[in-house]
């Protein structure tokens, strides 16, 4: 279970001390054993009093014995403590992964704890305990019920994975969903065979259909990771004056894949926030 780190009016987190206190409280109340991961979601640096991301030094005040990973409200960044860095062997010798950045302490290559885009993948795989099929179905149906209570009758998941899509099919076959659910698997990591196996569905079966695929070409304006054609007025800490961010998925991989999908008539969603990323999409 993740810690809710939302700021007002959604939540109650107003500063970094509040975040540290929530992490410490979870560890103490649940008597978590050393080495147990502590996860949170929803902090917004722009709404914190300090107007910055919590870094490893901040989170070390919560624990030096428990790896901590907190995800930004945009989903495009995360911050971790020293225990998390040590457990994953991330240090000054770690290179930035393609499409991501490990932020560093000023004047050094030592990670400061903040991870941009694909750098989150250095940590975020297999941290959550697997959800069994019964709980998965319960959570899905409770979520649909909440949407329907607000009058929303079509729900889209633009970041699905194929294993969860298969579980959704089994669940919907057991009992039709109360709203239409359309899923688009996140396809940045699909190889050619996986992409060729996708068959988009034009109609719903038991309230579910696979709508096509989705790619992500860049990050978010909030995180200063949206790919721009002109430099940011204010980039992330330590960024060069000509900082424009970067693509999270290279054109040389995207172009042949989108051409294949268009030829096959497969609907394709593309995350492209910055104007340079939009140009990548148009030119592709």
Segments (PLM) and residue ranges:
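Acidic (Asp/Glu)-rich catalytic clusters
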Residues: 172-175, 198-208
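Short amphipathic
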Residues: 209-215
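Polar interaction faces of repeat-based domains
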Residues: 283
